[in-house]
Amino acid sequence: MENEGKDNGEFSFVSDGGAETGRRGLPKIHTEKNAPTTERDICHDDSTTPMRARTLEHLHSLQKKRSTPTTPLTDSQGVFSPVSEAERQKQQLISISASLASLTRETGPKLVKGDPEKKKEAHKASVLDHLHFGEPILNLSDSALKSTHILYNPSPAELYEQAIKYEKGSFITSTGALATLSGAKTGRSPIDKRVVKDDTTEKELWWGKGSPNIEMDEHTFLINRERAVDYLNSLDKVFVNDQFLNWDPENRIKVRIVSARAYHSLFMHNMCIRPTAGELEDFGTPDFTIYHAGQFPCNRYTHYMTSSTSIDMNLDRKEMVILGTQYAGEMKKGLFSLMHYLMPMRQILSLHSGCNMGKNGDVALFFGLSGTGKTTLSTDHNRYLIGDDEHCWSDNGVSNIEGGCYAKCIDLSREKEPDIWNAIKFGTVLENVVFDEHTREVDYSEKSVTENTRAAYPIEYIPNAKIPCVGPHPKNVILLACDAFGVLPPVSKLSLPQTMYHFISGYTALVAGTEEGVKEPQATFSACFGAAFIMLHPSRYAAMLAEKMKKHGATGWLVNTGWSGGSYGSGNRIKLAYTRKIIDAIHSGALLEANYSKTRVFGLEIPDAIEGVPSHILDPINTWSDKDGYHETLLKLGGLFKKNYEGIHTYQVERDSELAEEILAAGPTL
């Protein structure tokens, strides 16, 4: 190398005996060894492949590829088979437009598939003009002149984007869950729930004293439906979920949920059964539709309305309307009420229960009200979880109604509930929780928004979930009661009439609080352990339960997870370790081999010994130092049972008065 470029400093760059210089004498640098002379005015970087995009807009369009259409259906009986992708999308939109049709104007909205914020031209098959369903009797409204954008079965990732961008109060937590707020209502509003009373439901449904069903007429329902549909059609976009209920393929129900919030769409994506792409192609017309317009109030001056909130169900039209509440649990429990009507019509028993299965195929059902340990005891690492809340029992066995879990989060900890803790990750909806503003770590002990904090996640997030969520006929039916009076045995074997009696009663006790000076436990009863959701008389569900238990040889058990040695305040809570030993003995069949004796008043059969459980606690009288106090409290609880049962025994179970009398006789004797 030779120094020839004095103006360039100490060094110059020489090629083939001479230095190449630019206009100002600076050396040119080539990264390509044999760069053509025509390109020597450009500095090349050949360390990466050339960029294919010409503009930023083009680059962003390359980031996402269009979903590949699934293989066209070959079954000629398929709703959309076999048709082009464009025609299939058009038929989907026609079905959705029919769902959103105004009954007054008899038209459906003009639909566009996709996010309205996307400026690119819509695919020609994804646009549908408003359709007339019959001759219009009024002029079109302004909403008919605009397009309603449909986000159809969006993925969790898409719903995260929608929620965070457009819904105030939506955040990603430190574990990846979506934290959101349900607005003013942080729980269900049972006093605002209405069911249309018509010629059919008047005869079939349970009305009157003790019933959760509050009537409304069809005219009022249609007013609220029109209000909800008009609100949804006025929006720039709505979310549409087409999903299933019931894992039993022979008895599954197709449901459509139309909502205004990404939060509601993701919640139902998690809670209902998620269809495959092929199942969506053949989805067709839904069996039931929910119109969730919860951000818009009902007219409280409309007949049957008592507030700005109304949750209305029309079983004849197969529709549900939600106005004035954004609490997502209304959709879940509304569909559960629907199943409590539809399934018994098919001779299938719908149940508010947990369900698990042993490795040998033995299935157990767990019934229990809040605080009885239903979730804790049905979640067993040695057994498969079929479901935590809603089930059906058909001739095929048991099946979960849902595709997800809706777990309470208050005071949640990794140590107590590791499965729920670990399920709170990307895709999970966290309702009304409080988190650190910087780290986004959730404080599950915080109750400043509500005590009813919840997590909704797919059941696949539970490691030992059984997928598909079905199982054989149950061997054991376990009724859980948290008896704060301290007089029920830790476990009792029930006869069939006793099982029906305690199933209809649905007993537990609320622990005394400090409010209003309450110092004693309070008994609470919820028929079939879910009175708020049943549609028929409790005795009809009990009769079906008895028939199935008798046919398949299931055994009934009453397990007290409450107090022993005295009532709340003087006795002690039965140790969870003892209750788990009892449940294990039920699962293994060991309790069937035990010797039994009968208690007074309730006539319950109690075992004399259980491995791992102190024998003296099995008969509650042994744990009370005040024997007179025990007998007095026992009679008091028996009286509360009898008072609760008044009126129910007059109903003829499936027109079988003898069966009704057997159930009544299985109650306490005072």
From Swiss-Prot:
Principal place of residence: cytoplasm
EC number(s) recorded for this UniProt protein: 4.1.1.49
The organism's place on the tree of life at top rank: Eukaryota
Listed SUPFAM superfamilies: PEP carboxykinase N-terminal domain (SSF68923), PEP carboxykinase-like (SSF53795)
Chain segments carrying region Disordered: 1-48
Presence of keyword ATP-binding: yes
CDD domains: PEPCK_ATP
Biochemical pathway: Carbohydrate biosynthesis; gluconeogenesis
Reaction(s) the record says it catalyses: oxaloacetate + ATP = phosphoenolpyruvate + ADP + CO2
Keyword Nucleotide-binding belongs to the record: yes
Enzyme class: lyase
Tissue occurrence: Cotyledons, leaves and roots.
Binding, ATP: G368, L369, S370, G371, T372, G373, K374, T375
Location in the cell: Cytoplasm
One Pfam family this sequence matches: PEPCK_ATP
One GO-annotated biological process of the protein: gluconeogenesis
A single cellular component GO annotation: cytoplasm
Disulfide bonding pattern of the chain: none
GO MF terms held by the record: ATP binding; phosphoenolpyruvate carboxykinase (ATP) activity
InterPro entries documented for this protein: PEP_carboxykinase_ATP, PEP_carboxykinase_C, PEP_carboxykinase_N, PEPCK_ATP_CS
Biased composition (Basic and acidic residues): 29-47
Keywords: ATP-binding, Cytoplasm, Decarboxylase, Gluconeogenesis, Lyase, Nucleotide-binding
NCBIfam families for this protein: pckA (TIGR00224), PRK09344.1-2 (NF006820), PRK09344.1-3 (NF006821)
Family: Belongs to the phosphoenolpyruvate carboxykinase (ATP) family.
The protein's name: Phosphoenolpyruvate carboxykinase (ATP)
Gene transcribed to yield this protein: PCK
